[in-house]
Amino acid sequence: MSKVQEVLDIVKEMSVLELSELVEAMEEEFGVSAAAPAPAAAPAAGGDQGGAEAAEQTEFDVVLNDAGQKKIQVIKAVKEATGMGLKEAKALADELPKAVKEKVSKEEAEELKEKIEEAGGDVEIK
């Protein structure tokens, strides 16, 4: 068994408290932060419109607005499409609206939207 697989197996067996302590220890040991990077500021509306066309958006966020009547199917679709664990997918579906995936290509965003809508969710691409 590879070292990576051994570490993954150990992490799978840890409690949430132990995982939190692990993250803190890694932050201290390696001098990094596990916090998500701050989003880039959006350009001001009504800016330079002097004949220059706005650049076409290349990264999209897929936002789940409502899980609908088939919440379990939506959670399963989110879990399968994102690789999240069941607990994370359920937490996402409980705190709506919430981004399912961020900064993905238009094609990936459309595929994800279609899968979640087929399961009964209300999805928006931003």
UniProtKB/Swiss-Prot annotation:
Composition skew (Low complexity), residue ranges: 36-55
Family annotation (InterPro entries): Ribosomal_bL12, Ribosomal_bL12_C, Ribosomal_bL12_C/ClpS-like, Ribosomal_bL12_oligo, Ribosomal_bL12_oligo_N_sf
Keyword ATP-binding: no
SUPFAM superfamilies noted in UniProt: ClpS-like, Ribosomal protein L7/12, oligomerisation (N-terminal) domain
UniProt similarity note: Belongs to the bacterial ribosomal protein bL12 family.
NCBIfam families: L12
Domain of life: Bacteria
Function: Forms part of the ribosomal stalk which helps the ribosome interact with GTP-bound translation factors. Is thus essential for accurate translation.
UniProt organism field: Natranaerobius thermophilus (strain ATCC BAA-1301 / DSM 18059 / JW/NM-WN-LF)
Gene (UniProt): rplL
An annotated GO cellular component: cytosolic large ribosomal subunit
Pfam family of the protein (one): Ribosomal_L12_N
Region (Disordered): 36-57
GO molecular function: mRNA binding; structural constituent of ribosome
The keyword Ribosomal protein is assigned to this record: yes
Protein name: Large ribosomal subunit protein bL12
CDD domains: Ribosomal_L7_L12 (cd00387)
Keywords: Ribonucleoprotein, Ribosomal protein
UniProt GO BP: translation
Oligomeric form and interacting partners: Homodimer. Part of the ribosomal stalk of the 50S ribosomal subunit. Forms a multimeric L10(L12)X complex, where L10 forms an elongated spine to which 2 to 4 L12 dimers bind in a sequential fashion. Binds GTP-bound translation factors.
